[in-house]
Amino acid sequence: MAEAHKYKKLTPIEHVLTRPEMYIGSLDTTATPMFIYDEQKGHMVWETVKLNHGLLKIVDEILLNASDNISNRSARMTYIRVTITDTGEITIENDGAGIPIVRSREHKLYIPEMVFGHLLTSSNYDDDNQNAVAGRHGYGAKLTNILSLSFSVCCRTNGREFHMSWQDHMRKATAPRVSNVGTKEKNVTRVKFLPDYERFGMKEKKISNDMKRVLYKRIMDLSAMFPNIQITLNGSSFGFKSFKDYATLYSAMTPKGEKPPPPYVYESKSGCVAFIPSVVPGVRRMFGVVNGVVTYNGGTHCNAAQDILTGCLDGVERELKKENKVMDTNRVLRHFTILVFLVQVQPKFDSQNKARLVSTPTMPRVPRQDVMKYLLRMPFLEAHVSTITGQLAQELNKEIGTGRRMSSKTLLTSITKLVDATSTRRDPKHTRTLIVTEGDSAKALAQNSLSSDQKRYTGVFPLRGKLLNVRNKNLKRLRNCKELQELFCALGLELDKDYTDADELRYQRILIMTDQDADGSHIKGLVINAFESLWPSLLVRNPGFISIFSTPIVKARLRDKSVVSFFSMKEFHKWQRSNANTPYTCKYYKGLGTSTTAEGKEYFKDMEKHTMRLLVDRSDHKLLDNVFDSQEVEWRKDWMTKANAFTGEVDIDRSKKMLTVTDFVHKEMVHFALVGNARALAHSVDGLKPSQRKIIWALMRRSGNEAAKVAQLSGYISEASAFHHGETSLQETMIKMAQSFTGGNNVNLLVPEGQFGSRQQLGNDHAAPRYIFTKLSKVARLLFPSEDDPLLDYIVEEGQQVEPNHYVPILPLLLCNGSVGIGFGFSSNIPPFHRLDVSAAVRAMISGERAKSVVRRLVPWAVGFQGEIRRGPEGEFIAVGTYTYCKGGRVHVTELPWTCSVEAFREHISYLATKDIVNRIADYSGANHVDIDVEVAQGAVNTYAECESELGLTQRIHINGTVFSPNGTLSPLESDLTPVLQWHYDRRLDLYKKRRQRNLTLLEQELAREKSTLKFVQHFGAGHIDFANATEATLEKVCSKLGLVRVDDSFDYILRKPITFYTKTSFENLLKKIAETERRIEALKKTTPVQLWLGELDQFDRFFQDHEKKMVEAILKERRQRSPPSDLLPGLQQPRLEVEEAKGGKKFEMRVQVRKYVPPPTKRGAGGRSDGDGGATAAGAAAAVGGRGEKKGPGRAGGVRRMVLDALAKRVTRLLPRLLF
């Protein structure tokens, strides 16, 4: 009970006075750089002034009350008058609608008395009201009253006048005086107050000169926001006729007297945006106002305005690229100051301070073309624009432009993989051709198949590795692409040369020879893109300079030993349909390496038969820009979304000898794009990518489920499922599917036996595939019941049935495990959710709740995570690690966001150590638990929010989903996962209906067979069948006569029984079996599809409840015990924030709950207000010996002295807590 006196309950007024920083910011005066108006220079300057945020805020609250009255259209407002006396008394008066002078029926108080003298009174609580005002929380003017020595108000509204005054920080008040005045008297609201300057640290008890300048600038900002209202300070107006007048004040001459260009200003009803250029580059600065509120910390509106400018600069950059120029956008941005003044409906700020806008702004529709034209006129732009035909192009020409003049010997030594044509003489009968192959195996096929005569005028060059996209003449990227450099060198090309024909090159044609798959299409596209980007005239003026060599993808061998070749799967399938009764065997040629040398000789025997000439038109430049330019993301998204659902087929007629760029892009490149997305993006129903689906399917059909090495299993899976993309990628996929640590998989479909990775590196620390074992986990068959298998739609590859198009698990696995993937133009980042919450979501759907309502209650989570999920300022989710802050600066970190590895955290701490924020780290973490001690430097963090931010203990969780819908089309979901839940629910319920009907049919067929068998046995037992003299024909006649059921058009299931089947024991067993089958049929008839689903969900839930319990126990067992409460600093501990109330769905509550957003606290002492805190004592000791705050002395001696004092301060800081406690 001795500690009871420490606990106090404060009144609201006492709380504001005791903790004012929670409401208005710091009361301390600090040196703050900001825009300020310089009366002598007549324009704005960026200057450091002594600013008191709290004093500015209480004045601002009354100013904003006045400006909010502008939106009240019941009476026109014409002026706001501000007066500041020498003693510091401030008066703010405005006309307009005024405050109603009536008593509240509910509270029996006059409305002005409530508005100015009772906390939490406001007229802005109606969120349906579309007024653009600054007030929101009901504190405003009351905070000014509480923090003032005197406060009085006079309201004159509609013929009545109200007077009332307060003293002693709103604790004492006079009685309200109400009188009648003439109805013609103008409405007025006048507030007069004297701030408690001493409380704001101003010993002279009056306003400082710097604060007068700050308030002058603040009132000037308000005048710019509302130029139609006469706003004056001490009787003087600012004279702004428009926002442009105000924006011009930010333009300043250089020290050399250079005049800056005029600002770009755009004004609209929703606000104004200005881009103010400066001749000399500086630091990027932005200044924003929302409904009169100056957002000193920026916010979403400032970011949006900068995005507009950046987007326009990007547009300028694209235009310059067409002129063979490049621009340094970041350097150009440093020339601009951005102003954004917005009028917003119901704006949301990060706190009562309103220093940062967090809601999505409605920006003025700035005409971007006008801004681009404006930017192109900037005189400083030229300094940041350069041609790419400068030094880099010259250096590259030295490497790739001298090939034409190189001797064969020089080429032999410089490009070792080039097999050059054996003759250098030109033959008019034959075009000198360079065959460009995909890899060495294709090179071998070409080289081994060419005849001796063909080798005289044909060279071969293999492309190894991935080519780079050099669109827009990106020579920096070209410099990093050795493959293209050597190709251009072999051809003898020179950069920036306009070729009229190809005769001056070493080869007059290149023939691209790649695999007939999506990767081959990509290589063709990159080669075409490189030549069209760097030498467009060469392709336009020389049709067929780039040609495509096609080889069969399928060969069908008929009974007469004739062979039919097919160059596309579409062509093959068409032939199959028209020759359905023709017997044949087929061979698939996915890669060029499949072809034999004999087949290769056959191809090259008639080379032109297999060659398609590429025709390029000047208009194709724009189309290739859309496909390969990094800026054209939206076009590519639209391109692929409009494409048909992925079928795995290329729709190009290979019989034609000409191929246009348009056909290539829309029929072959789109094939690569869709295949790439199919590999990278998950299916909405089963949450799997094709490689994962192949692994599951192959392991399910594997006999037995014994663990095997990952390296061995990859070979089996690759063969069984017709996987064509290398066993290494398959092994990596298997390892990821087996990872079960926090942040790995919430549901691991494979079992990890060995080192499959840990939280140390988020799985990247796994052992080699040849050392680790895996097998299918038990949960796989819980999610994918074997009874589903016959009802799924399977893919046919190379003539064999492989994995399903997609599985239909009992839960949407995409929500359980999440999915991350980067495709072609699309990406996906879906976080995982608690698997039992996903189960509860499905149950809620079954009970009739709408998917949208259910998804709103789902909160991201990783199994084993010991932290919490908070709501962010913009409604997003934030994963937060856990720590305890101990005396002496020791921070015991016990959890990290699951997307942060322990190693990444250690690297971050190492960086903080270089900044003197952290002194040391002790890591006790294991494979799946976090246990780290960090010693933080004294004074480095002052609030829990700073501690979380500095140590990197928070991580925003982004939801941006693009998935394949049930019908196979790309479906961008953005942040709404409702379709995933709905699609899965529809498909799974439909599958249960089909499964129930199928099982019922199978049971009825089984019962008919059993009853037929019983009837035959009874007939035999009665002596009606003489087996000794019967033939098969007579027995079949007996069965037919008895009306027995046939199976596969025979009675073998009865007639092939062993003699022991006719014993009494077998007869009794048969009767029992029939009774059991009848019972199962009746039970299944009474069971609905929903009941089947719920039964399987129950099994899943029981399995994972036990699994999670064991996992959490193991984590807690490994971790060290927490520090005792006596060692903790209360002021720096993480708060237990209030849980958001879930809307609807009370029947199915979620395990994971999100905590409400609370604005981060402002700075305060590390140890709170307690005098006994070790942190506070250490800070005082550090200050006593010099510490961080001491100014540097002059010269070398001062620097040495400071180093000694700093070292001494650190030692005292570490030792004092041990001595005192």
Curated annotation (Swiss-Prot):
SUPFAM superfamilies: ATPase domain of HSP90 chaperone/DNA topoisomerase II/histidine kinase (SSF55874), Ribosomal protein S5 domain 2-like (SSF54211), Type II DNA topoisomerase (SSF56719). Signal peptide: none annotated. The record marks 822 as: Important for DNA bending. Binds two Mg(2+) per subunit. The magnesium ions form salt bridges with both the protein and the DNA. Can also accept other divalent metal cations, such as Mn(2+) or Ca(2+). Residues 432-546 form the Toprim domain. Mg(2+) 1 binds at residues 438, 515. It is found in: Nucleus. The keyword Magnesium applies. Transmembrane segments: none annotated. Its cofactor is Mg(2+); Mn(2+); Ca(2+). Belongs to the type II topoisomerase family. This is DNA topoisomerase 2. It comes from Trypanosoma brucei brucei.
